[in-house]
Amino acid sequence: MRAAGKQLRDNQQMRIAAQQNPDGSAYTPRRPQVDDKTHKLRRSRARMFAKLSKTRWMAVRTTADSATIQFVAGAGRLANIHQHGLRDRVNKYGLQVQYPARQLLGFSDADIEMVREMLLATVGL
């Protein structure tokens, strides 16, 4: 189970880095930011969730019959907001913003097939 969990985590990390949902569609793009002084649009080319896709923030927990991939610490809160498209404050005293749903964790067809193959290889079929 541990090997399957690690492989799934690696697949999730690559997908998050590529800015894609499990079905292959692209994430909803960031909202354009406005400069407070000039009131013009800022050009931001930074990737979303750049640090969130690192191994440090994605934990694999395994038992004899299951594997779980989850975000740890404060990263879990941030990931939950984006996974489900919830409302949150931009900063401590800022406005509340409705974030679009961006599916960070999920199974693609390739992931399901990979887990199936690993389980069959373990059982010996």
Annotate each PLM feature.
Residues 1-92:
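Short, low-complexity, charged/polar segments at coil/turn and helix-coil boundaries
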